[in-house]
Amino acid sequence: MRYPLRLIAFISCTAVLGCSQSSDKSEQAGAAGTRADLKKECFRAVFEKDTADLVMNTTADGKVKGTLVMSYGEVKPNAVEKTVNRGDIDGSFKGDTLFVNYTYKTGSVNKTVYTNPLAFLKKGETLIMGVGDIETSMGRTYFLKDKPIDFEIGRFKFQPGECKN
C-alpha cells in the first residue's frame, strides 16, 4: 500500500512543478517581449593580449543583465586550452557605477561555476572595470565596504562596439 501512495505523490509533485515552471517561463517571455525600455549595448576591451566582450541589457530603472567573456593571453605549450572566462552578469547602476555579480565558468574543461562581484565606472561612453578587495562570507563574495574600488589600475577599459547577433 505504501508504494502506490509514494508513486502517486511523486507523479503529483512532478506534474505540479512542471506546470508551474512552464507558466513562469511564459510570464518571463511576455514581460521581456513587452519591454520597450530595454536598451542593449555591446562593449569590447583590449589590454595587451587579453580581451573582454560585454553585452548589457539595461532597463529604464537601471537594472542590468547580460554576458561577459574574458580571454586571457595565449595558449601556453603545456596548457589544455586558452583561459577564457564565460558567464552572465546581473546587477544595477548606483550613480555612475555599475555593480554586478559575474557568474562564470573558466574554460570548457573546468565545470566549476564561480561568482564574483565586479564594478564598472561609466565615464562618457566608456566603462572602466575597477579593482577592489573582496571577501567571501557564508558562501557569498562581495567588495569590502571600508575599502574603495580603484578604477585607475583596472586593466579593462570597455569601448562601445557593434552588437553581434
Kindly give the residue locations of the regions a language model identified.
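Sec-dependent signal peptide recognition
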Residues: 3-10
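N-terminal glycine/threonine-rich, aromatic-flanked beta-hairpin/loop signature
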Residues: 57-92
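Short, solvent-exposed loop/hinge segments that bridge or flank secondary-structure elements
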Residues: 45-63
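Beta-sheet ligand-binding and adhesion/scaffold domains
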Residues: 58, 63-70, 97-165
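Short, surface-exposed coil-to-beta transition loops
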Residues: 49-53, 82-88, 111-117
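Tryptophan-anchored aromatic micro-motifs
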Residues: 31-50
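C-terminal motif of bacterial Sec signal peptides marking the signal peptidase cleavage site
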Residues: 15-18
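Bacterial Sec signal peptide processing site at the extreme N-terminus
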Residues: 20-35
